Amino acid sequence: MSNTHRARLERRIAGSTNRWRFPKQPFTGDLLSLSQMFKALSIDFEEALRNPDRLYISQIQKFFCENFKNKDIQSAEADVILECLGFKWELHQPQLFQSETLAKLYLKALMQGTTYPLRELEELLRAQSPKKTKEKSPAKRMIISLKINDPLVTKVAFATALKNLYVSEVEINLEDVLGVLASAHILQFSGLFQRCVDVMITRLMPSTIKNFYEAGCKYKEEQLTTACEKWLEMNLVPLVGMQIHLRKIPQDLLHKVLKSPRLFTFSEFRLLKTMLLWVFLQLNYKIQAIPTHETVMTFFKSFPENCCFLDRDIGQSLRPLFLCLRLHGITKGKDLEVLRYINFFPESWLNRVTANHYHALENGGDMDQLKDLNTQAVRFGLLFNQENTTYSKMIAVYGFFFKITGLRHDTTSYSFYMQRIKHTDMESPFVVYEHKPVSLRAARLVKYEIRAQALVDGKWQEFRTNQIMQKFGLTKPSCKSHILKIQTVGIPIYVSFAFIFPPS
């Protein structure tokens, strides 16, 4: 007897009990090992065939995946025909068991098609065992059917999903990833489903955020929906808000993002402009290019003045979104004029904003009505890009001037801080004039937090100071805030400065 033949027939022990199997082709036509396999898994196979939904398919999957993962099946005859999407797909039993859906369909078909299902399975497995070609008899092909109603599943995407049963690293194209995800969900092919999620998370952009988020909601994939929310928190204002894709952002996703304390914006007024543009695009669906800010303002101004936009039937459903905005953080005179000009907000909202501003100005900037830094702070932001080595911006609130600054020390080291500036030290007198009034107060109590976020390998890194209470003077060192120092390879870096002026 040849060594090859001897090796094929020799059994070896498997596990700590008296279970034996052929070492070369485990569980393929080896009826003793097949029987022992199910005994080891405590599976009543006859009962499992009567109730396939109760069977822990993953237990059998593990055996098939380990033993047939890289097996060359190109020359092997298919033993399962899957009828789906108007096509007949030829499959092989070991690969089929990677899909829980197909495995259950197979077992149901096995139960319905024969009086002795276990014997039928044994014959199918025996047909796979290595024999001389002339000794092989063709195995009976099992036919199973799968009906798919998900519109995301295309024939190309489904073919890609089935190909992944055989080859683990099949490339998933961006244009097909939604269909492959849907196919993996229907097939209950968990490994492929996770691969699709990973691809989608790394390919979030203005053109994909809407479809990827809705897919995450549809298939209850929290990892994907959370990734979409975090991505939009950073990119709503600086990126999506500059493109026509803003129109597609779902209202529920927008609401979540607006409530998030991590939301990045250059200023409260810039966030308002983004939201007004979103509403404009919802109502003017034929427009395919981003309009100017003046066009948007003129549109809202065109409604009759007897009723503001949010009090109209068309605006009632949008109130929750605009209640998330921090209108009290809009302090520049010309921006406040815009609030009234567009006739968008109820008069009571505008009166409250005006009253709070007057109170703060009369009391040296004190923001008595603001308590919670996470939900009420005035926010300003810097977007630190690859080309920046030093980047700063001047901001002013109630006559107090601050410079928010970012510095790059080397390829991965950065620091960020804010510093109070005398109005007489401003580089341009126009800045003082634009932000009037001017406070002559020597010290200003500020409660603030500096936060920096960057995307690295599909995951967000977040760096932040504590919530700090500090009196800002006009000379060093009291004029300078705590410095946030970070190490990251992520670019760009989204830096937020949030603060309130407590009573002092």
Curated annotation (Swiss-Prot):
Entries under Pfam families matching the protein: BTB_BTBDG, BTBD16_C
Domain of life of the native organism: Eukaryota
BTB domain ranges (all copies): 148-204
Signal sequence bounds: none
Family matches, as PANTHER family: BTB/POZ DOMAIN-CONTAINING PROTEIN 16 (PTHR46843), BTB_POZ DOMAIN-CONTAINING PROTEIN 16 (PTHR46843:SF1)
Protein name: BTB/POZ domain-containing protein 16
Species per Swiss-Prot/TrEMBL record: Macaca fascicularis
Gene that this polypeptide is encoded by: BTBD16
